[in-house]
Amino acid sequence: MSAYTAPSQIAQRQLDYFNGKHVLVAGEVEDLFPLELAEHCESVSVFTSNYSYFRQIRGHSTITSYFGSQLEADSQADLLLLYWPKAKAEAEYLLAMLLAKLGSGCEIVVVGENRSGVKSIEKMFQAYGTVNKYDSARRCSFYWGQCNTQPNAFNQADWFRHYSINIHGQQLEIQSLPGVFSHGEFDLGSQLLLETLPSLSGKVLDFGCGAGVIGAFMAKRNPTIELEMCDINAYALASSEATLAANGLQGRVFASDIYSDTADDYRFIISNPPFHSGLDTNYNAAETLLGQAPQHLNNQGELIIVANSFLKYPPIIEQAFSNCATLNKTNKFSIYHANK
């Protein structure tokens, strides 16, 4: 069984495309194929918005790795290897941002699972040049093309979606980049959580902050709290920072792979935990969030989360805290609470 994802396996079949190239890898890359690629190329650099993946690859000396919502560094790459992301809007964003950096003449290879909508590259790339499919395997597709026009300059501010919410009389302006959970809209789970939250005090962590809706609401309604907001996704961090700024609010926003970079003395941990990874359902992060929460709360600490009611979170919370209460419930979502 291969250690590589299916998109990497189809790229591995076509190594001749990469020989002698300076390759920039971006998108939904999840494995260590870039290390093998480095053996066939002049250079390999990886741009990722996923902090967990960045932590996995940043220690390897044969590649250069970057984490962020946009690539700030200069690049000598002449070939972009794009792993198709789950959100079409994120693919558009990555193409606009990275091709503006690499310029006309840059080659592109796109790999992705067919169910992810990778076929969309055929139409999406027309603004830059031509791209064609050259291989199919493992329910994936391999495209090659070349940018033959000078891409427009990239301005991240143009890519934010803006929307307003009003809960309990609190009016908030939300800023959201492509690739962020519930991009450009207010999800019903978070709404139920905000309607249920008690008054807060002390040091509060918004875990998996997304576009910053929960953190901004908590800061506006409880102006004396010490707010921290973390996420694994760089687009979420940039969105949360923009949301706080748009509402004149203060908070520390930082990257964390679950609890990798968090404190251990929170009065409250508040979350709408993620349970999707790429195209698949993945409970690992949420289970670690819940199971290890007591280690990151102070002696009076409390955990409050919203979750789809079908998810079996109460037993995990009960095991970690020896208590779990349901504060609110609809036919789709539940609000769970636990005391340390």
Curated annotation (Swiss-Prot):
Keywords carried by this UniProt record: Cytoplasm, Methyltransferase, rRNA processing, S-adenosyl-L-methionine, Transferase
Main subcellular location of this protein, as a coarse class: cytoplasm
UniProt entry tagged with the keyword Iron-sulfur: no
EC number: 2.1.1.172
Record-linked Gene3D superfamilies: Vaccinia Virus protein VP39
GO cellular component terms, A-Z: cytoplasm
Keyword Cytoplasm tagged: yes
CDD domains (UniProt xref): AdoMet_MTases (cd02440)
Gene Ontology molecular function terms on file: 16S rRNA (guanine(1207)-N(2))-methyltransferase activity; nucleic acid binding
Taxonomy, superkingdom: Bacteria
Catalytic activity: guanosine(1207) in 16S rRNA + S-adenosyl-L-methionine = N(2)-methylguanosine(1207) in 16S rRNA + S-adenosyl-L-homocysteine + H(+)
NCBIfam families: PRK09489.1
Family membership noted in the UniProt record: Belongs to the methyltransferase superfamily. RsmC family.
Role noted for this protein: Specifically methylates the guanine in position 1207 of 16S rRNA in the 30S particle.
PANTHER family: RIBOSOMAL RNA SMALL SUBUNIT METHYLTRANSFERASE C (PTHR47816:SF4)
Record text on subunit structure and interactions: Monomer.
The protein, known as: Ribosomal RNA small subunit methyltransferase C
